[in-house]
């Protein structure tokens, strides 16, 4: 494998953890970032000297930029970066606090710019690459997930600009677009939505309760019908890291392939009708 020294952003759980494991099994030297000290201790205990952990809070991208520059300067070389960290807040658009949108953009978009700026000098030296974890939610605007959807749509354009600006200097940039992923974070998300639904007052429940109920119904069904495991998505990330000439985008998961294929043949009106039927059922 050409990518011998890899930075994995968000290596504590889900796809990021699976990517770290695959890279270690291939003999790569991995540096990863996590949010909590306990997560770092757990990873370093599991992998020993094969994985080095750093605490980075992506909700403050200015501080994250400084930290990522420090991380890169401590490495003798950097062959690849895999960005797997994100948050996925849920809720009706009308009720979602503006602070939720700001935090989602900071973590899911602005921090990606910080990572790009911090790592590009080293990646130019090795002809390396960056792999970002997007979502089919960057192509399909899912009801009840406006903050997440907005950031993933933004990431699509951001990745295109990164790829076009990096390519002339020998750095490749790819985006992986998974559908549903069976992770602890997603299951906790369902718990949180049930809690938020139960906490609605009578007025908000009358106005918006169907959105919570529809989301729970759609998400629970989706997790059982074609959703991927974190390991399966990680394999696609690894494909993007290893390919001699990587694709600009990789669709990960049978559900993602089906959804993107279907949506591509539908009008906006048809898509609106489809989502309204799913949520009003």
Map each language-model feature to its residues.
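Active-site helix of classical SDR
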Residues: 116, 151-154
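Rossmann-fold cofactor-recognition segment
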Residues: 47-62
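Conserved NAD(P)H cofactor-binding loop of Rossmann-fold oxidoreductase domains
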Residues: 84-89
